[in-house]
Amino acid sequence: MYAREYRNGGRRRMLFSALVCVALLYGAKGYAKPDMAPLGPNIADRGSAFYHFRVENFDSADGRRHYRVWTGIPDKKAPASGYPILYMLDGNAVMDRLSEPLLKQLAEKSPPVIVAVGYQTNLPFDLNARAYDYTPALEVKNGEAVGKSGRYQRKGGGSEDFRRLLEMRIAPNAERGIKIDPERRGVWGHSYGGLFVLDSWLSSSFFRSYYSASPSLGRDNFSLLARLTASDKAQYCHKSLFFMEGSASPGKNAQTQPTDTMSKIHNGVSAMRQSGLAVEYWDYPGVTHGPMLNASFRGALLHMSTGRTLGISQCDKSASR
């Protein structure tokens, strides 16, 4: 099992495929529906030979959501430019899956600081909190919000508030006393978290690398994807965006839904690349929505540790005029 990277460059494709093969081997622990069993001790509790961790708690501005943030700091000395750093949503689930063998792999290259942003719960997900924090406000047409009903019943639309908390309170505390390379600051999210990453790519310049895994684009009838494809490249020259999507999907529409979704994403990525934006599509063949969490977060970490960036010279050239 491997991931296909849709862009030119055989050597880069082979390197990425090798990295994600490893990520997928570690990604066997995944579920079509969230496993809400209480979590046991994680790598921060057990200790690591390659990273040390600190934990901090935060509250939302309205006092309704409560966060726990794990910051994993490599024991390996920082490079002259500073550590890369990856902010990871659904931090409880990430910490439950973060393993010593993976940390060892990261340490063998350029290990990133890992900031796992979770909630003050012993469950892998706080479903109500993440639904609010990770989703942008729905587009309003004719006085009504454009979005799906049914499965999308939890209150959403709080991504702007959460992004403000993440960038203005959580990040300064997480990076305190650590030498960070701001040019290698990334963010990863899965499902609703993937939506947050896309919305942040449009709305914020705090990060440089944006990893959006299986974003729940159907929530707003793909209007967010339309906004992405209409982006002016001059505003986004300094950013890299990675769509990470499995080419299988659970449920009764497994034969039609993935093809439609992937086709729309492929077309969107193609349009963005043609306009000079630094965008890639990473395909995980045969991986369903749930297991994409495991495969994609490991893929993002491994990618960050290589120090690779997308070629954005065309964008840089146009922006300098």
Please give the residue ranges for each predicted region.
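N-terminal secretory signal peptides that target proteins for export/translocation
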Residues: 1-10
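Bacterial N-terminal signal peptides
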Residues: 17-26
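A domain-start/cap signature at the N-terminus of enzymes
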Residues: 30-83
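Serine-hydrolase catalytic machinery in alpha/beta-hydrolase-like enzymes
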Residues: 82-165, 169, 173
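Alpha/beta-hydrolase fold nucleophile elbow
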Residues: 179-190
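Gly/Ala-rich beta-loop-alpha elbow adjacent to hydrolase catalytic centers
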Residues: 189-193, 197
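Mobile cap/lid helix-loop segments that gate and shape the active-site cleft of serine hydrolases
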Residues: 203-239
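C-terminal catalytic histidine-bearing segment of alpha/beta-hydrolase fold enzymes
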Residues: 242-252, 259-321
